[in-house]
From Swiss-Prot:
Transmembrane segments: none annotated. GO terms for cellular component: cytosol; nucleus. Arginine methyltransferase that can both catalyze the formation of omega-N monomethylarginine (MMA) and symmetrical dimethylarginine (sDMA), with a preference for the formation of MMA. Specifically mediates the symmetrical dimethylation of arginine residues in the small nuclear ribonucleoproteins Sm D1 (SNRPD1) and Sm D3 (SNRPD3); such methylation being required for the assembly and biogenesis of snRNP core particles. Specifically mediates the symmetric dimethylation of histone H4 'Arg-3' to form H4R3me2s. This is Protein arginine N-methyltransferase 7. Belongs to the class I-like SAM-binding methyltransferase superfamily. Protein arginine N-methyltransferase family. PRMT7 subfamily. The active site is at E144, E153. Its EC number is 2.1.1.321. It is found in: Cytoplasm, Cytosol; Nucleus.
Length: 683
């Protein structure tokens, strides 16, 4: 059965009504998931297997019959491990229907259907008894309910319910316990992702609103590959602190709680950020440990087991605080059902028993600007590029129109002396944030904010003025892939009749770049696994492949490549250019070509990004920020996501000119889509 669904088009800005199968969302979720990453996580799989074997041995040593409950079974891998380890029977719970179906197929293919029962329910809906989903309570509880924050997927309520209704008192648990660690640091790089900094523009200092400076920030965790944050980008104020542990073999409470750790400051500085991660002990003795600690905490960083389904967390303190070396401080972590947050105090006091309120944004800026967006707005070099470009084109009689979400460009244009500045801010919340910036800096009359879309704009909205400068970063909150910011082009086309004949467009053009790459690790999220710890999990590979094929074409996907090291195997190549000085054309734009491979390696796919030509002399890159090194090392813009086009399988390249990266792209103006195909061909 098919239904018509309204989907907002991030490139054209239109609401597209498309006919979709009722299975569309299922396939989208599977295609965008990273299930394969878990199966490729050898460290995780080996530790779980070892822990399960030990738990089964302990139950048998007590003279009991091992009965396992596996909550969040996924592929059924842990259940198959349990049965292979000697469990008598296993109840495997999986709430996501396509996943439960895949688990049933995998269990059957491996010959465990008589020992494993797949239950397609949420664990809190499972019943026990002669007519229930489970015939009896389990004496071994195996789970993989964790996310980067440990408890963000509802682990605590699930454990709480399981101990009350699904497992025996004194059951074995794998993992047996989890421990949260934290380190208080000063980091200019990371703090720029939390607060707006003063910005200098031609002798004017643009100050952040007081409400923004005093705001506790976004409530959600910032999860990143902390191993990619250079150690010289932060200074440790505290040692690594053990904040608290949860014993999963005993009844677990999901009630809000707080834990405090005292320490003496290792150095003076500004306490700004808490770096946090966790580990899980698979056995009571703590001999089998799976840790999320970043690579720089290892004696040998090369021994670090890469994974993307569990990363590390960055928490921003509500406000930065000055601390002195040797000062006694207290770091407190609090949690509710699903999230953690941290606070710092200097004074002596008793441990807080009741968790304080979870911090939340009160200024709206942290809801309008994402953390990478804060970093982008605080990027001095980037700001200088835009200011220099504006300085070169603005005149005293310039009438400017800005088209970008929550942008400071119109403020810059006013400070640089433009006669009139208008800015389209169709989001009411973004409009209020920019109003705060203008009010704080006594610029309220300098920029006229219009809460309408480009196609609604009229000459009356512009006080009868025609536009002499149309500008944009461009940045739009709805953009996922680099080329979604072509929405600027559609806005430019919509206001074409309001432009002066000789109007300047900034940026004047955009170029889509591509480079073939070998990923150090990111390939694991997309490449088939086949077998995992001796079990055939190929039905999972097939399910992911079917979901990827469900779309009409092989698509690129967004990733922040600064977190995922890769090596360039070709030179960066411009593959399509979009001329913003002209309106969006009626006919498709096509581009075909080939670029030789210059590096030897395994090509996993193609990285894609936009570069904007602000003027003839000034460009800003949303991708590579430096020339690729001779060895192929890439440095990526940390504030924007790049596109990645994964090949269906890795291809070996010689780098001696025998292979080319061939490309074929077509931009469809009516849909805003770029159909793309990349292949490796013999020269």
């Amino acid at each position: 059965m098919k239904t018509f669904c309204g989907r907002a088009n991030p490139t054209t800005g239109a609401l597209d009504w498309v006919e979709e199968s009722e299975e569309y969302d299922y396939h989208q979720e599977i295609a965008r998931s990273c299930y394969a990453d878990m199966l490729h996580d050898k460290d995780r799989n080996e530790k779980y297997y070892e822990g399960i074997r030990a738990a089964v041995r302990r139950v048998k040593a007590r003279g009991e019959r091992p009965v396992v409950l596996d909550i969040g079974t996924g592929t059924g891998l842990l259940s198959m491990m349990a049965v292979t380890a000697g469990a008598d029977f296993c109840y495997a719970i999986e709430v996501f229907k396509p996943m439960a179906q895949a688990a049933s197929c995998i269990v059957e293919r491996n010959g465990f259907s008589d020992k494993i029962k797949i239950i397609n329910k949420h664990s809190t809906e499972v019943t026990v008894g002669p007519d229930g989903d489970m015939q009896e309570r389990a004496n071994i509880l195996v789970t993989e309910l964790f996310d980067t924050e440990l408890i963000g997927e509802g682990a605590l309520p699930s454990y709480e319910h399981a101990h009350m209704h699904l497992v025996q008192t004194g059951c074995e648990a794998v993992p047996h316990r989890a421990t949260i660690y934290a380190q208080l640091v000063e980091s200019d790089m990371l703090w720029k992702w939390a607060q707006m900094r003063p910005i200098d523009v031609d002798g004017h200092r643009l100050m952040p609103p007081g409400a923004v400076q005093e705001c506790a920030g976004a409530p959600s965790v910032c999860d990143i590959q902390l191993s990619q944050v250079p150690t010289d980008a932060f200074t440790a104020i505290s040692p690594v602190c053990t904040m608290f542990s949860v014993d999963f073999s005993k009844p677990v409470s999901s009630a809000a709680q707080s834990y405090t750790v005292r320490f003496k400051s290792q150095t003076g500085g500004r306490a700004q950020v808490v770096l946090s991660w966790w580990d899980i002990d698979m056995d009571p003795e703590g001999n089998i440990v799976c840790t999320m600690a970043p690579s720089w905490s290892y004696a040998d960083p090369h021994a670090y087991p890469w994974r993307d389904h569990w990363m590390q967390s960055v928490y921003f303190l509500p406000a930065e605080e000055n601390v002195s070396e040797g000062e006694e401080l207290m770091l407190m972590v609090s949690h509710d059902d699903y999230s953690l947050w941290y606070s710092l105090t200097h004074s002596e006091q008793n441990d807080v028993r009741v968790a304080p309120f979870r911090p939340c944004c009160t200024c709206q800026a942290h809801l309008v600007w994402t953390r990478p967006r804060f970093g982008e707005l605080n990027d001095e070099q980037r700001t200088e590029s835009y200011v220099s470009a504006l300085r070169s084109i603005l005149k005293p009689d310039s009438v400017c129109l800005s088209v970008s979400d929550g942008s400071l460009l119109p403020v810059f244009a006013h400070l640089l002396g433009s006669k009139k500045v208008f800015s389209l801010e169709s989001s009411g919340m973004a409009k209020q944030v920019i109003e705060q910036v203008l009010h704080t800096n006594s610029l309220k009359d300098g920029v006229q904010l219009l809460g309408i879309r480009a196609e609604q704009l009229s000459l009356a909205d512009l006080d009868g003025n025609q536009i002499s400068v149309l500008m944009g970063e461009p940045y739009f909150s709805t953009s996922l892939l680099p080329w979604h910011s072509l929405f600027f082009w559609y806005c430019r086309t919509a206001v074409a009749q309001l432009l002066q004949p000789d109007a300047t467009i900034l940026p004047r053009a955009a170029t889509l770049y591509a480079v073939a790459v070998e990923f150090q690790d990111l390939w694991r999220i997309r490449f088939p696994c086949g077998t995992c710890e001796g079990f055939d999990v190929s039905p999972m590979d097939e399910m992911i492949q079917r979901s990827l094929d469900f779309r009409e074409s092989w698509e690129a996907e967004p990733h922040p490549l600064w977190e995922y090291p890769c090596r360039a195997l070709t030179k960066p190549c411009p593959v399509m250019t979009f001329d913003f000085t002209q309106c969006v054309p009626e006919q498709p734009i096509s581009s075909d070509g080939a670029v030789p491979f210059t590096g030897r390696g395994r090509c996993h796919g193609v990285a894609l990004w936009m570069e904007y030509q602000l003027t003839d002399d000034i460009s800003v890159s949303m991708g590579l920020t430096k020339a690729v090194s001779q060895e192929g090392a890439c440095e990526w813009n940390p504030h924007r996501k790049q596109g990645v086009f994964f090949f269906r399988s890795a291809k070996e390249t010689s780098g001696d000119g025998r292979e080319d990266l061939s490309y074929s792209l077509t931009f469809e103006p009516h849909s805003g889509d770029i159909k793309m195909d990349f292949s490796i061909t013999e020269s």
